[in-house]
């Protein structure tokens, strides 16, 4: 199995149930794990053009999150998963995604709240 993991990429997004909560962008952590259909060509060639560019991957995540304001983490995760699948289906057979709200507006909650979603890519 060949897998690429990008862990805890911070994205600033408009998210929240209330208008007040969405008014200021909030930090969201996105982690994604991509399982490849076969050995990526880059493993043999050592050429960046034969692999998935990390910068392009996180840029896709950032742009998608910025262009799709959501009330809830669950919806944001689904939107991101759909975009990743659309962009990477020819290369990957499975996508695991975790979206974490670093600072949920809940008193005494000291750690992020996360939602995870996983999909086998046909």
Swiss-Prot record:
It holds the Pfam family FolB. Keywords: Folate biosynthesis, Lyase. The keyword Lyase applies. Its EC number is 4.1.2.25. SMART domains: FolB. GO terms for molecular function: dihydroneopterin aldolase activity. Gene3D superfamilies: 3.30.1130.10. The active site is at 101 (proton donor/acceptor). Pathway: Cofactor biosynthesis; tetrahydrofolate biosynthesis; 2-amino-4-hydroxy-6-hydroxymethyl-7,8-dihydropteridine diphosphate from 7,8-dihydroneopterin triphosphate: step 3/4. InterPro entries: Dihydroneopterin_aldolase, FolB_dom, GTP-CH-I_C/QueF. It catalyses: 7,8-dihydroneopterin = 6-hydroxymethyl-7,8-dihydropterin + glycolaldehyde. One of its GO terms (biological process) is folic acid biosynthetic process. Catalyzes the conversion of 7,8-dihydroneopterin to 6-hydroxymethyl-7,8-dihydropterin. This is Probable dihydroneopterin aldolase. It comes from Chlamydia muridarum (strain MoPn / Nigg).
């Amino acid at each position: 199995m060949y897998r690429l993991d990008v862990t805890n990429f911070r994205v600033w997004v408009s998210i929240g149930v209330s208008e007040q909560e969405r008014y200021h962008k909030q930090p969201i952590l996105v982690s994604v794990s991509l399982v490849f259909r076969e050995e990526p060509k880059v493993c043999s060639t050592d050429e960046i053009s034969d692999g998935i560019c990390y910068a392009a991957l996180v840029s896709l995540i950032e742009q998608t999150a910025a262009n799709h304001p959501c009330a809830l983490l669950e919806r944001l995760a689904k939107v991101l998963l759909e975009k990743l699948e659309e962009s990477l289906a020819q290369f990957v057979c499975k996508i695991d995604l975790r979206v974490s709200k670093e600072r949920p507006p809940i008193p005494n909650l000291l750690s992020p709240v996360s939602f995870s979603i996983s999909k086998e890519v046909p």
